[in-house]
């Protein structure tokens, strides 16, 4: 199944210079250049499928919300991705969530369900939404952290054991990622894996914290559109003044960026 999917859109390992797969190394992470939003979705879906299918055991993926990943998710519910993905071996979690019911249009889990989870043969126990009904924001964050600790098998992060295999992230025009928002107290949280984000500039949310995200084997940013060009350029150049600038990974940080977002890097 892997070989079949590779013909759809191959993922090639990182390299120090740009190659035929349009991979290059800026100051921060590895850039995977994509022609447009559709190409980004295809390359992202191919990467997820090839990665999961190549592993002997389970793969834990943290999904991103927003508009950019939705076409990628929709491809996962179509052939050849639908047959290539080892659904019974993949656990699907969330990088952040708005404190709303799954039926709310703003729900990241609700979007993922509509885009692909309801249309693929994934075991129900492999899908991990945030419980938002009948709990407080703090309880929702603690419950989700407890779920992650159960998956991980420990209450303490270990240097040689990633918490998540792949974490998908978006990038805001203000440099935020997940719900790690500029100037918010959540940026300073270093003793929790999941934290609440009280209502302020945005609605109530919960988010993975830096310690949790940075314990990922691979972090893959999905960045599309000219509105992200300036902030992406600064981050790729090494500017550390944005929340997304402080994302790390046990392996690599990948940037899947389309031509509009990549700008001079394209």
Where do the model's predicted regions map?
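A glycine- and small-aliphatic-rich helix-loop capping segment at beta-alpha/alpha-beta transitions
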Residues: 74-85, 110, 114, 182-190
């Amino acid at each position: 199944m892997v070989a079949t999917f590779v013909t759809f859109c191959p993922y090639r390992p990182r390299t120090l210079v740009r190659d035929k797969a349009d991979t290059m190394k800026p100051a921060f992470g590895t850039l995977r250049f994509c022609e447009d939003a559709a190409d980004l979705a295809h390359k992202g879906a191919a990467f997820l499928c090839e990665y999961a299918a190549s592993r002997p055991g389970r793969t834990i993926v943290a999904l991103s919300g927003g508009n950019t990943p939705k076409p990628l998710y929709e491809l996962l519910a179509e052939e050849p991705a639908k047959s290539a993905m080892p659904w019974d071996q993949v656990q699907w979690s969330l990088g952040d969530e708005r404190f709303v019911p799954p039926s709310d249009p703003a729900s990241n889990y609700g979007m993922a369900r509509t885009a692909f989870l309801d249309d693929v043969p994934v075991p129900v126990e492999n899908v991990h939404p945030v419980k938002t009904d009948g709990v407080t924001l703090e309880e929702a964050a603690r419950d989700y952290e407890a779920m992650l600790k159960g998956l991980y098998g420990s209450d303490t992060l270990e240097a040689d054991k990633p918490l998540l295999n792949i974490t998908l992230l978006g990038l805001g025009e203000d440099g935020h990622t997940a719900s790690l928002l500029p100037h918010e107290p959540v940026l300073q949280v270093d003793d929790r894996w999941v934290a609440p984000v009280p209502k302020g500039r945005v609605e109530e949310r919960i988010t993975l914290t830096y310690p949790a995200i940075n314990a990922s084997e691979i972090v893959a940013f999905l960045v599309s559109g000219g509105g992200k060009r300036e902030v992406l350029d600064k981050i790729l150049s090494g500017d550390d003044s944005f929340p997304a600038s402080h994302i790390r990974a046990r392996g690599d940080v990948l940037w899947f960026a389309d031509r509009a977002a990549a700008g001079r890097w394209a």
